[in-house]
Amino acid sequence: MDSSLAISGGPRLSNREWPRWPQPGDRALKSLEDVLTSGRWTISCAYQGRDSYERQFASAFADYCGSAMCVPISTGTASLAIALEACGVGAGDEVIVPGLSWVASASAVLGINAVPVLVDVDPATYCLDPAATEAAITERTRAITVVHAYSAVADLDALLDIARRHGLPLIEDCAHAHGAGFRGRPVGAHGAAGVFSMQGSKLLTCGEGGALVTDDADVALRAEHLRADGRVVRREPVGVGEMELEETGRMMGSNACLSEFHAAVLLDQLELLDGQNARRTRAADHLTDRLSELGMTAQATAPGTTARAYYRYLVRLPDEVLAVAPVERFAHALTAELGFAVTQTHRPLNDNPLNRPSSRRRFATDARYLERVDPSRFDLPAAKRAHESVVSFSHEVLLAPLDAIDDIARAFRKVLDNVREVSR
């Protein structure tokens, strides 16, 4: 039997049809048809005599996150920017941002004319490093943002302690972590606010969407103003044909509302989330056991994690493998064997072509500001190391049966056995 690698013309190890994403539930189509005929396609349309899907989702997701309040928002990026402003961050303020993340972690800060301070990550969890965080705090720091990255929960014990001692709000970015938990409580409910993305690749998705959860009524009220052009949902009942949004004039905002279509899909997806997460965790645990036999190190999570949510499965290659084959070539070889995309981590934000504030005139307020927001001024050795040593794949693969997960382990073994072929 030909054992050469698929990238060299050999046979693929697996010809399976892997699970696709997103996966609609049973109620999605009926709910979307209901929105179409309801006469109300968004919260800013007139009240039609029943709770909107947006209001239903706000209530359901607040309950799911163990939070008092939820403000649905159009995207995860907008949710983060709104959370920062709602917590008092403004122009020129510094915000701690993890250096290994999607560009939105920085662009949301830039979007409110604040300054992203890129901080290195823990070398095992790839989440914000507490010691590096404390070292980066200055008299200009106004908030700490932490991403629960890929499949890990960050060290909230240490980060919350730092935030309290310095009098700073901690904002949890849970874009990868719908359903994860820390010390028995859902992520997003530990800091001043938690924000979520419901973009198409996420564990809970409606194509594009977001949300902010909080126990702080003042933060929630400011977030409502910021996402609805300075309007808030009326607290008193309204009649059919009346506007449910009230113009208060207390705080200027912009339009970042979530439509009824998106909210309807989210209610459908929320019913499926826990079951899907359980299947992913079972598959991830099985794969971690198999790959550990090959000398691979799976992404760790902080002590105190009580539930993991696998947005992406990450594993670090052994040093002796990396000495022979670059990580991008190893990932490419796995992709060829399995038929789904295996990639590196995000590129660190200090060396990421998507994170270039100088490419936009809106950030050219003055030369000093451009210097402060220049990402290349930060050193992120652990983030760089992760990008150069870790391979990853998306969560829907973990919804496959366990015999398919065994194929993944066999693909790793095949590439390892032919690693010098990968280096060509």
Curated annotation (Swiss-Prot):
Pathway noted in the entry: Antibiotic biosynthesis; streptomycin biosynthesis
Keywords per UniProt: Aminotransferase, Antibiotic biosynthesis, Pyridoxal phosphate, Transferase
Keyword Nucleotide-binding assigned: no
Reactions the enzyme catalyzes: scyllo-inosose + L-glutamine = 1-amino-1-deoxy-scyllo-inositol + 2-oxoglutaramate
Statement: the UniProt record of this protein carries the keyword Transferase: yes
Annotated segments matching region Disordered: 1-21
N6-(pyridoxal phosphate)lysine modified-residue sites: 202
Enzymatic class: transferase
A Gene Ontology biological process term: streptomycin biosynthetic process
Family under the similarity heading: Belongs to the DegT/DnrJ/EryC1 family. L-glutamine:2-deoxy-scyllo-inosose/scyllo-inosose aminotransferase subfamily.
Quaternary structure note: Homodimer.
Function: Catalyzes the PLP-dependent transamination of scyllo-inosose to form scyllo-inosamine.
Record-given protein name: L-glutamine:scyllo-inosose aminotransferase
Species in which this protein is naturally found: Streptomyces griseus
Encoding gene, per UniProt annotation: stsC
